[in-house]
Regions:
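ABC-family P-loop ATPase nucleotide-binding domain
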Residues: 1-38, 324-341
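ABC transporter nucleotide-binding domains
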Residues: 27-34, 39-233, 239
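Short, structured secondary-structure boundary patches
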Residues: 64-65, 78, 158-163, 173, ...
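An acidic, carboxylate-rich microenvironment
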Residues: 85, 101, 123, 138, ...
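Short, basic, helix/turn surface patches
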Residues: 124, 164, 303-311, 328-341
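ABC transporter nucleotide-binding domain
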Residues: 198-284
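Short, charged/small-residue-rich alpha-helical element at the C-terminal edge
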Residues: 251-325
């Protein structure tokens, strides 16, 4: 223990030390963390050494092609599937040891909504409210949040696909969760339905402070609503961070003639140019180095048609991550069932 040095009370100008205050509680930095989480079904590794870090608040986009391991991961976050190895922490606590306390604080919509088609939207929600011991007033509240108040008395079988998805989200919201997990919530919707669900997700996160994890295989959807993304392919987390971070620093491209002479002069400056047709490719350089390189080439009689910094588009970076093959390990296990990813 450390003690602050104080002046003796008899000293001139002595001021009693202020009482120490307890540290101010800091908000939980991550709503969800996984540490080395792996899931195997028999010899098949579906999720491999996954380290997610989902910040509290905002929208976390979980991107990956079909079968990449998105649904399996979300099931493990809900305790519906048990990790083969690794740890899942939700709200800073181990899920396995604190499941009964954690799960009531989570809402989810995994692999589509389930409801009684012959009952109305409101009746379906009352059943969920009864099961979760929620106040009946929450039914009207969530209907309003998802924009189904006018359709509350309509049978669920008469709902459009987009309305059914919103009903499923309403069911997930009825307990007032702090964390919402949505698995491909816009799958199969027309553009209007996609926009409705997207706007609802952003509203839940930014206006109501709910942490939302939403999975999708479409970059264009996640790009319009997520603050942070995790990209998974073949069970491996290939990238995690802001979407802007997917763009690399780019390449400095010079269109020159003659190319061979330009390469020789740039190498003399200590640079490492690569030629591609009538272009020279360099890593990004400081402005003063670019100016020096251009002056050297012009002085040597090399014609320069263009100098530009090229960056990958988000789509190019995403496709590069998700189309590169990943070798998955196999386990010597011979028992167990195969599961969906």
């Amino acid at each position: 223990m450390m003690f602050a040095q104080t002046t003796h009370p008899s000293a001139v100008g002595y001021t009693p030390p202020a009482p120490q205050m307890p540290p101010i509680a800091q908000p939980q930095q991550f709503a969800v963390e996984t540490r080395g989480v792996t899931k195997r079904y028999g010899r098949q590794t579906v999720v491999n050494q996954l380290n997610l870090a989902i910040p509290s608040g905002g929208v976390y986009g979980f991107l990956g092609p079909n079968g990449a391991g998105k649904s399996t991961t979300m099931k493990m976050l809900l305790g519906l599937a048990k990790p083969t190895t690794g740890e899942v922490r939700v709200f800073g606590r181990d899920l396995r040891a604190n499941r009964a306390d954690i799960l009531p604080r989570i809402g989810s919509l995994i692999e589509g909504p389930a409801f009684y088609p012959h009952l109305t939207g409101a009746q379906n929600l009352r059943i969920v409210a009864d099961y979760l011991s929620c106040d009946k007033s929450s039914v009207d509240a969530v209907l309003d949040i998802v924009g189904l108040t006018d359709a509350a008395g309509k049978r669920a079988r008469q709902y459009s696909l987009g309305m059914k998805q919103r009903l499923g989200i309403a069911m997930a919201l009825i307990s007032g969760p702090e964390l919402l997990l949505l698995d491909e919530p816009t799958n199969g919707l027309d553009p209007a339905g996609v926009a409705e669900i997207r706007n609802l997700i952003v509203q839940l996160a930014h206006d109501r402070g709910i942490t939302v994890m939403v999975s999708s295989h479409l970059l264009s959807e996640i790009e319009q609503m997520a603050d942070i993304v995790g990209i998974i392919q073949s069970g491996h987390l290939r990238y995690q961070g802001p979407l802007s971070g997917l763009r690399d620093q780019g390449q400095l491209v010079m269109k020159v003639s003659p190319v061979n002479a330009a390469v020789a002069h740039l190498e003399a400056l200590g640079l490492r140019p690569q030629s591609a047709g009538d272009e020279i490719i360099l890593p990004p350089l400081r402005d003063d180095l670019i100016a020096e390189a251009v002056a050297r080439l012009v002085g040597a009689g090399v014609r320069i048609a263009r100098v530009e910094l090229r960056r990958k588009s988000l789509e190019e970076a995403f496709l590069e991550l998700t189309e590169t093959p990943v070798v998955m390990p196999t386990s010597p296990q011979t028992t167990g069932r195969r599961g969906r990813a």
